Amino acid sequence: FANDDELLDYIQKTHFNYMWEGAEKTSGLACERIHLDNVYPQQDQDVITIGGSGFGIAGLLVAIERNFINREEGVARLTKIVDYLAKADRFHGVWPHWLHGPTGKVKPFGTKDDGGDLVESSFLMQSLLCVRQYVKDGNEKEKALAAKIDELWHGMEFDWYRNGDQNVLYWHWSPNYGWEMNFPLEGYNECLIT
């Protein structure tokens, strides 16, 4: 790269393109992985990453500001994403770690990890709240998008993830295994986002 600006352009465009061109088709969200050879031995090409989608959504805002796409294109994609998320599996308002893209149904991350994932959902919601702030004073489509995000945000039952009246949030809850993963959010790690 000739200079830092070229490097920054390259990094931002590449990040944006993963979410724009590489997105799962039904949802517009980030795929868990993309194999450039299009060979998926585990048949997981349609798996959506909830936390990774949060990072990708933030990248869409950068893409609008950098004129990689226009605002109308960005709002259309973000509306598609939010509409999909409103219909996808949620567990007390919280999405699972992974979703099966075409159906919006949970794709278990592990044996007992087939329900709500509070930390991954927090990565997603952090970016959705950035989108909300970005569009809340815009045109009617943008205001409608902000209102939909408010519904999703207010639907997240953080108090449920206290496992009763415990004074801590828990990472996972499963409709099949309840609180068996028993992972309280504590320490200096990715759970601080929650």
Which sequence ranges carry the predicted segments?
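Well-ordered alpha-helical scaffold segments within catalytic/enzyme domains
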Residues: 1-7, 17-18, 54-69, 84, ...
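Membrane helical hairpin/interfacial module
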Residues: 45-54, 58-113
